[in-house]
Amino acid sequence: KKYKTINITYKVVGSDKIKEFKPNDPLYLMEESTTAGYKNKAVMNLRTNDNHPNEGKIEFKVIDPITKKEKIENVTFRFSSIKSEIFVEERDQTSDFMTHLKRNTGISFVRAGREIDFGTFDFFDLSIATERFWGCEILFEPILDEVFGVSNNKQGVKNMNALNAYQKKE
């Protein structure tokens, strides 16, 4: 599967200059993004199969607020990891590339196709350099807002810490 980039240009107010806008891709799957030193190359590979029924998905039973009927909604987990040749190539911890990776290290929560939160959520230690070599997106629809503790302004999630023993049992 190839991930496409939408190229957007914009004009700065009070200027005749046209600038190009590139997306920031926390999974590093897009060829055209803001990744330092890799303008036209994806630096990571997708490690989950989006179309496989048993991989990367958790089903939640919820009550539809409109129909009041129970329905199943999916939460999709997508993971990427650095390509081996780039891992070997990029050893300088102070390079622009490594700085870019460090800024993007974390878990992205994506609600209805839009990233609403990003961070470590206490699942791993950001200071460990090897944590920079993978990415994670957790995708869900608005019907699951309560499950994720989505704030009223739709700008974040709450209580996304490691599960305790009781929660794991449930």
State where each predicted segment sits.
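Active-site loop ensemble at the mouth of alpha/beta enzyme cores that anchors a bound cofactor
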Residues: 35-41
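N-terminal non-catalytic structural scaffold regions of very large proteins
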Residues: 14-33
